[in-house]
Each structure stands twice: as structure tokens, then as C-alpha cells.
Amino acid sequence: MPSPIQVTDFSFEKEVVNSEKLVLVDFWAPWCGPCRMISPVIDELAQEYVEQVKIVKINTDENPSISAEYGIRSIPTLMLFKDGKRVDTVIGAVPKSTLTNALKKYL
């Protein structure tokens, strides 16, 4: 069963920027209630889009450099990267349909 990949400040470039697939990045923290609410949705997307999309999670508390680089001010923040560039951002615990529609735009 596919699940999101945990990335760090050190693995972000390899896993996200250099990925040949579309990448959904979930910026989260363990103390964040809305992050915990959206986590099952992220897990479902990881299963449904296993062939087309790489889904990664980055803990903002443990990885402040990447969070600062991308201007993360509130969490959860979800960003889509295509060909190494950020192409879309969704902030907050949104419905699965919102994320699905965002993914479909770039597939």
C-alpha cells in the first residue's frame, strides 16, 4: 500500500525538485489539528495516484529551511511541483475534491 514519502531539508531537492513526476508536497506539523484531519486524504491520494503523482510530507518543525524558502506561514500547506517548479498551492484542510481537481490540472 503506497504511502507518502517523508522528506527533509536535505532530501527535498532529490525527491521534489528533481522528480520526473508531478509532486504534491504536504507541509505539516504533528501538533497541527487540521494537518491530522487532512492526513487520511493525503494517504488516499497516494494510493489513487501512485503511478502519476509522487506525494511527500515535510514536517515544518523539523525542517525549517525548506519551510522558510517556500514562505510557509500556515499549515497544512500543500504545494504542487511540476518539472521542479511550484505550479500550485492549496492552504488549509480542504476537501479531497479540491486536491483532486488541483492534481488533474497538471496531469
From Swiss-Prot:
Subcellular location(s) of the protein: Plastid, Chloroplast
Record GO terms (molecular function): protein-disulfide reductase activity
One GO cellular component term noted in the UniProt record for this chain: chloroplast
Originating species: Cyanidium caldarium
Transport recorded as keyword: yes
PANTHER family noted in UniProt: GEO12009P1
Record site: Contributes to redox potential value: 33-34
Active site as annotated: 32, 35
Function of the molecule: Participates in various redox reactions through the reversible oxidation of its active center dithiol to a disulfide and catalyzes dithiol-disulfide exchange reactions.
Main subcellular localisation: plastid
Name of the featured protein: Thioredoxin
